[in-house]
């Protein structure tokens, strides 16, 4: 259950939510009308075996409410997880660009609610599918609610919102049999891609490791569109929004994703929840790319094109503030499911551009809430309520919670003293611009280069990231049944990069496509690679320590302490869950879980504890041996000390392993024969350094059977 935060000093939004909260673990059971009941297990009948009576209003209320508990799920982004927190600007450097106070008031913490999500799958689908991730943030500002409704990709698959229904129809389960669920690896999506080259840049992101985040806490977020900041004088500046995680950008491996989907389909939402509950609050830095209006046409692409990025090397990202998530919701449905984001929820100082995808989102998000949340009053739901004062002339409608007072509900009026009145300060004013032209159903020529940035993305990858992209295309297209679709996609890839197309074709058994005329001098953007960025922290990383009776208690406790000092989470896994293990030299070690019910894919690293009897038991257990082998195959740091080194040999790890008490680190396999109170701190240091790099990309494990 969620941590009890009632004693915390609440922010304005938490104070607002208090009026809607009630505790189920106190008081007496009542009906919806507040009538106490003394029996709820049997309906009212005539005698013990007679007919049930309709006059049992309590039973009818229970069943009727149950029958109506479900609401329509979101058409996209149905599966999600959310959390509360705050945003705080570093300084007032944006004051010259925007009138938005929450961006320009250092020391002011603006409450936020963030919802992360997958896109294609239904509400009950797995977290670790290959997909875009939603990253939507609701800022409860003093000037009203502002929603930054972004993704973990900076680009989208289409340029014009009129194509959104067909894109979603293509990626969703095919209509004749409702298969596959939460997957892009099927004919209709790739048929769409082969015929719509504007999708290719986003498809490159989808085939990359960016589509497989290790954690919501370890992925970037982007506003996708070019927005406009407007200052107090009405002057505009184009802006792109970026969220950068403090923990770095890290991903799972595709084989891990598929296994986690079965082992723990709630993997990402559980990770977010547990991190917040344990006080390891996720944090992101908000950055902006600013482009003066005079420079609108100085790029080789159109700023209004949502399938393009502004390379950070051309326009650096300016850090302007931080966001911290520090509270889990009290009720998933009431908060995470009923939260309603809308790209048109803006505040003074932030405005739109003529991005044709953004314009349709501004219509669609409001429209969809009307059916999903049962009418026009969804903004009154507790999670959606602004902390700013709300006074409108809109009234009535389903689920009206407010009780407006007074006779007038229109403007202008004299009966109500002219109120609610129009303000002349701190108001939203639409950006003033001249617009003229002929009515035409056509996109600008600057929108037509669909291959250049897709090529830039691929060329900016590290070798291992490029390998993963090739493998992803081969996997996805290998699931496509119609060979002509596979060939058509490969032909499109040839216009992105001939080597990419050739490698994918080879893996599919297709002839190498003819070489296309491509610009080999295409620029690269190092900022696009997440591997070259590395890492410098192991905070919240999960380490599994394998042990059994006879374990070296002193050495294990020492290692655990050294890792926890660095912020890692260490769990002892044994053949049986719970209880304690008897130490080989006395003492006991608490067991957290059993490795028979867990898996290496749920951890970032594995360590085998010392203790001859413990290691002997583990060596005879196929689960334990596979646990180590699988983690090794997935390039994770592996550690062993004392007799634990012997289990690595049993697991088939052929790296150089320690033969004495010196610490040896060979491709993130860290070993020493030292143990107990002689376990050197350098062992922990080397292991932590390897873990901070996330994986050892130099390790070749294709032949490892796991």
Swiss-Prot record:
PROSITE patterns in the cross-refs: CATALASE_1, CATALASE_2, CATALASE_3
UniProt region (Disordered), positions on chain: 512-532
Highest taxon above the source species: Bacteria
Cofactors: heme
Molecular function GO labels: catalase activity; heme binding; metal ion binding
Organism: Mycobacterium avium
Its biological purpose: Decomposes hydrogen peroxide into water and oxygen; serves to protect cells from the toxic effects of hydrogen peroxide.
Protein residues bound to heme: 365
EC number(s) per entry: 1.11.1.6
Family: Belongs to the catalase family. HPII subfamily.
GO terms for cellular component: cytosol
GO biological processes: hydrogen peroxide catabolic process; response to oxidative stress
Protein's recorded name: Catalase HPII
Database matches in InterPro entries: Catalase, Catalase_AS, Catalase_clade2, Catalase_clade2_helical, Catalase_core, Catalase_haem_BS, Catalase_immune_responsive, Catalase_large_C
Reaction(s) this enzyme catalyzes, per UniProt: 2 H2O2 = O2 + 2 H2O
Name of one Pfam family that matches: Catalase
Keyword vocabulary terms for this entry: Cytoplasm, Heme, Hydrogen peroxide, Iron, Metal-binding, Oxidoreductase, Peroxidase
Principal cellular location given in the protein's record: cytoplasm
